[in-house]
Design a protein with these regions (language model features):
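An alpha-helical, amphipathic repeat domain used for nucleic-acid recognition
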Residues: 1-150
């Protein structure tokens, strides 16, 4: 809804902005009533797909904020994720390590050399330092056991 308003306000010329805003509100309310637009469903489904790709909860939250989703809907979505799995960030970080072949997925010889680089990659993807350190300090055997469970 936010992005549609922003787009139409910028693209329509020679019309009062208040008229455009009223028209947009009418159209959006009709679409919401007929369930073509559902922000709750969008935020839940987008969060699930981002978790499957190995994104952190912080990254999911910032993505949904950028899309203009209501803060209460974002809180509900994050709470659902944390209720399903209290340590979701840890498992998402493991998925990212597997995907990017960093941290415990590296060979034992290269792990100390790339430690700072790998921690910074996890931080750029929204993982906090404690989670990143916990993942980076995993043994290769423990990592492989967790990957098999995922």
């Amino acid at each position: 809804t936010y992005l549609l308003k922003k787009y139409l306000k910028a693209s329509v010329q020679n019309v009062k902005k208040q008229d455009v805003t009223n028209l947009i509100d009418i159209v959006l309310s009709d679409l919401e009533k007929s369930k073509f637009i559902n922000d709750q469903f969008y935020s839940d489904s987008k969060a699930k797909s981002m978790i499957q790709r190995g994104n952190s909860i912080n990254k999911i939250r910032s993505y949904l904020i950028g899309k203009g989703i209501n803060n209460q809907l974002i809180k509900d979505t994050v709470n659902k994720i944390q209720d399903e799995n209290s340590d979701q960030d840890f498992f998402s970080a493991i998925k990212l390590c597997k995907k990017k072949r960093i941290g415990p997925a590296r060979t034992e010889d290269n792990r100390p050399l790339f430690y700072k680089k790998d921690i910074s990659l996890l931080a750029r993807n929204g993982f906090d330092f404690e989670t990143s350190k916990k993942v980076m300090d995993l043994d290769k055997d423990d990592y492989l056991k967790i990957v098999r469970l995922l």
